Amino acid sequence: MDQKMINDLKEQVFQTNLLLPKYGLVIHTWGNVSMIAPNRQFFVIKPSGVSYDKMRAQDMVVVDLDNNVLDTNGLKPSSDTPTHALMYKHCPDIKAIVHTHSTFATSFAQADKPIPCLGTTHADNFFGPIPCTRALSDSEINGAYEHNTGLVILEHLKNNQVDVNACAAILVKEHGSFVWSNKNGKDAVDRALTLEQVAQMALYTQMINPHMKEANPALQQKHYNRKHGKDAYYGQDTKQED
């Protein structure tokens, strides 16, 4: 392995993990961010149970897609590592994953409810509702729990033909959210922050009007496509004249 590449990736993952408490997405030692190497042979993830204010870049743990620890500073990787590994193995577009127990998104997960698309804020960022997986069975919980968490995520994505680039988030029933990016860790955290915001908006909207239906499908399609479609026109061109 290229040690410079590993060190650079550790620094990126470290800095990105620090955004979770900064943005109010986690408390204590909850949550984690990982990023996969360009060759997709290994990924770097936050260590298990280490507080954010004591964590260092060199504490990030390097793991392969079969959960073998390749490089560590004497610390165990996040307990959610098998979930991340399975998603990287089966979703080649995913380059970074964020897992949190943020308040509003997790409330929907605990209620076994998808987050409906009720307006343009949601549609600008996620295509369609944010789905919620089925519950894990007792045998899945008592077996390889974190691996099985990954399996129920993949099961839902496959069975419902979810485009992981268009809807880059999922709720795991009774657990929390997993959010990902086809770009980098910072983008994945931004999406996790957006997920929390649209979950809060959805809850408040349903409190005001319990009978509120999802936003007009044409409006959803328009707002998603203008930012992410092949003819997207939101924002500035990459190259601009001086």
From Swiss-Prot:
Biological processes annotated in GO = L-ascorbic acid catabolic process; L-ascorbic acid metabolic process; pentose catabolic process
Indicate which residues the UniProt annotation says bind substrate.
Answer: 31-32, 48-49, 78-79
Which controlled-vocabulary keywords does the entry list? Carbohydrate metabolism, Isomerase, Metal-binding, Zinc
Specify which residues bind Zn(2+) according to the UniProt entry for this protein.
Answer: 80, 99, 101, 175
- GO function term, MF aspect, one: aldehyde-lyase activity
Cofactor(s) for this UniProt protein? Zn(2+)
Please state the Enzyme Commission number of this protein: 5.1.3.4
Does the keyword section mention Metal-binding? yes
Catalytic residue list: 124, 234
Its UniProt entry gives the catalysed reaction(s) as:
L-ribulose 5-phosphate = D-xylulose 5-phosphate
> What is its pathway?
Cofactor degradation; L-ascorbate degradation; D-xylulose 5-phosphate from L-ascorbate: step 4/4
Q: Name one GO cellular component term.
A: cytosol
Per UniProt, the enzyme's principal EC class comes to isomerase
Question: What does the entry's cofactor note say about binding and number?
Answer: Binds 1 zinc ion per subunit.
Q: Which residues form a coiled coil?
A: none
PANTHER family listed in its UniProt record: FUCULOSE PHOSPHATE ALDOLASE, L-RIBULOSE-5-PHOSPHATE 4-EPIMERASE SGBE
Q: Which family does it belong to?
A: Belongs to the aldolase class II family. AraD/FucA subfamily.
Functional description taken from the UniProt entry: Catalyzes the isomerization of L-ribulose 5-phosphate to D-xylulose 5-phosphate. Is involved in the anaerobic L-ascorbate utilization.
Record protein name field: Probable L-ribulose-5-phosphate 4-epimerase UlaF
Q: Gene name, please?
A: ulaF
